Amino acid sequence: MAGRSGDSDEELLKTVRLIKFLYQSNPPPNPEGTRQARRNRRRRWRERQRQIRKISGWILSTYLGRSAEPVPLQLPPLERLNLDCSEDCGTSGTQGVGSPEILVESPAVLEPGTKE
């Protein structure tokens, strides 16, 4: 469950509980009061949320040795990607996506020099 060798599941769960507690300790602001009071409460709430995000990132990097940001997914080169409908077409709701059966010619309206 932890995803890295050396990390115990219990340590990960304890860290997640701590971060969850931090977020639960800062509920959304009360929507009552004057416009200025609501604006001030939202501003203070957003600042606390930013602090909680920073603290959560620090906790993850310090206790688990990983960053709060996800690791970017490595994609294959575009040259290796293709649309091939020769295998099992239509099972995922994409029937006819790769078949070039219908040819559409550009309409004469878009040709240069024609006016209505």
UniProtKB/Swiss-Prot annotation:
Phosphoserine found at: S5, S8, S92, S99
Alphabetical keyword list: AIDS, Host cytoplasm, Host nucleus, Host-virus interaction, Methylation, mRNA transport, Phosphoprotein, RNA-binding, Transport
Processing after translation: Asymmetrically arginine dimethylated at one site by host PRMT6. Methylation impairs the RNA-binding activity and export of viral RNA from the nucleus to the cytoplasm.
Keyword Repeat: no
Keyword Transport attributed: yes
Region described as Disordered: spans on this chain: 23-48, 90-116
InterPro entries listed in its UniProt record: REV_protein (IPR000625)
Chain intervals with Basic residues compositional bias: 36-48
Motif placement: Nuclear export signal and binding to XPO1: 73-84
Subcellular location(s) of the protein: Host nucleus, Host nucleolus; Host cytoplasm
Record-level GO cellular component terms: host cell cytoplasm; host cell nucleolus
GO biological process terms held by the UniProt record: mRNA transport; viral process
Principal subcellular localization: host cell
Ranges spanned by the short sequence motif Nuclear localization signal and RNA-binding (RRE), renumbered to the chain: 34-50
Single GO term (MF): DNA-binding transcription factor activity
Region called Homomultimerization, residue ranges: 18-26
Signal peptide from the UniProt entry: none
Comment on protein domains: The RNA-binding motif binds to the RRE, a 240 bp stem-and-loop structure present in incompletely spliced viral pre-mRNAs. This region also contains the NLS which mediates nuclear localization via KPNB1 binding and, when the N-terminal sequence is present, nucleolar targeting. These overlapping functions prevent Rev bound to RRE from undesirable return to the nucleus. When Rev binds the RRE, the NLS becomes masked while the NES remains accessible. The leucine-rich NES mediates binding to human XPO1.
Entry similarity comment: Belongs to the HIV-1 REV protein family.
Miscellaneous notes: The OYI isolate was taken from the blood of a healthy Gabonese individual. HIV-1 lineages are divided in three main groups, M (for Major), O (for Outlier), and N (for New, or Non-M, Non-O). The vast majority of strains found worldwide belong to the group M. Group O seems to be endemic to and largely confined to Cameroon and neighboring countries in West Central Africa, where these viruses represent a small minority of HIV-1 strains. The group N is represented by a limited number of isolates from Cameroonian persons. The group M is further subdivided in 9 clades or subtypes (A to D, F to H, J and K).
UniProt function note: Escorts unspliced or incompletely spliced viral pre-mRNAs (late transcripts) out of the nucleus of infected cells. These pre-mRNAs carry a recognition sequence called Rev responsive element (RRE) located in the env gene, that is not present in fully spliced viral mRNAs (early transcripts). This function is essential since most viral proteins are translated from unspliced or partially spliced pre-mRNAs which cannot exit the nucleus by the pathway used by fully processed cellular mRNAs. Rev itself is translated from a fully spliced mRNA that readily exits the nucleus.
Subunit text: Homomultimer; when bound to the RRE. Multimeric assembly is essential for activity and may involve XPO1. Binds to human KPNB1, XPO1, TNPO1, RANBP5 and IPO7. Interacts with the viral Integrase. Interacts with human KHDRBS1. Interacts with human NAP1; this interaction decreases Rev multimerization and stimulates its activity. Interacts with human DEAD-box helicases DDX3 and DDX24; these interactions may serve for viral RNA export to the cytoplasm and packaging, respectively.
Protein name per the record: Protein Rev
Gene name, Swiss-Prot/TrEMBL: rev
